[in-house]
């Protein structure tokens, strides 16, 4: 079975079995809603068990979650550093022009048919995602995911076409 990362448990929260999660999903409300089923993977990326979300709330930059049947700190403390993943068949369909992070990370970025680099990470600083592009012999390039910059995403061809606006590339 194929799984995709949706968050990392970074700490416990209080004594009632809540955990702080750093999400790596655009769909946190859906992923962490009550009744959602996720898989726990340890720090060596080995499957541990499937869990069901009992509760979810936001606190600062964290998603605070609780697993069904685990209502005390002693039951969940061992999960610090573990990853939460969703099974591929539970991901759901996206609208046209929407993508999962795992589909974007690793794509090659081109400007006017010149290879710029490869997308290595996606940041969520505010209104728009920012794609971090690893380049040869240059610093990483930060590209906002907006229509005037990202012109075309072709998952099949493993390619993204962009127009790097003036001011985005401080090495030119």
Swiss-Prot record:
Gene3D superfamilies: PRC-barrel domain (2.30.30.240), RimM (2.40.30.60)
Location in or out of the cell: Cytoplasm
Gene Ontology biological process terms from the UniProt entry: ribosomal small subunit biogenesis; rRNA processing
Keyword Ribosomal protein: no
Signal peptide: none
GO cellular component, one term: cytoplasm
Domain PRC barrel: 95-168
KW Cytoplasm (keyword) present: yes
Molecular function terms, GO-annotated: ribosome binding
Record note on domains: The PRC barrel domain binds ribosomal protein uS19.
Family designation: Belongs to the RimM family.
Function: An accessory protein needed during the final step in the assembly of 30S ribosomal subunit, possibly for assembly of the head region. Essential for efficient processing of 16S rRNA. May be needed both before and after RbfA during the maturation of 16S rRNA. It has affinity for free ribosomal 30S subunits but not for 70S ribosomes.
Identification of the protein by name: Ribosome maturation factor RimM
Upper classification of the organism: Bacteria, Bacillati, Bacillota, Bacilli, Lactobacillales
């Amino acid at each position: 079975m194929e799984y995709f990362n949706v968050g990392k448990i970074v700490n416990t929260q209080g004594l009632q079995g809540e955990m702080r999660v750093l999400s790596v999903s655009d769909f946190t409300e859906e992923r962490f809603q009550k009744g959602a089923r996720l898989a726990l993977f340890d720090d060596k990326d080995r499957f541990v068990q499937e869990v069901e979300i009992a509760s979810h709330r936001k606190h600062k930059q964290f998603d605070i979650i609780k697993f069904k049947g685990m209502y005390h700190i002693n039951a969940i403390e061992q999960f610090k550093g573990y990853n939460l993943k969703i099974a591929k068949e539970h991901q759901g369909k996206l609208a046209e022009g929407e993508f999962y992070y795992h589909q974007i990370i690793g794509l090659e970025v081109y400007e006017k048919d010149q290879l710029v680099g490869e997308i290595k990470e996606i940041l969520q600083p505010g209104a728009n995602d920012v794609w971090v592009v690893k380049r040869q012999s240059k610093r990483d390039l930060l590209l906002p995911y907006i229509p005037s910059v990202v012109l075309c995403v072709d998952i099949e061809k493993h390619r993204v076409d962009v127009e790097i606006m003036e001011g985005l590339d401080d090495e030119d």
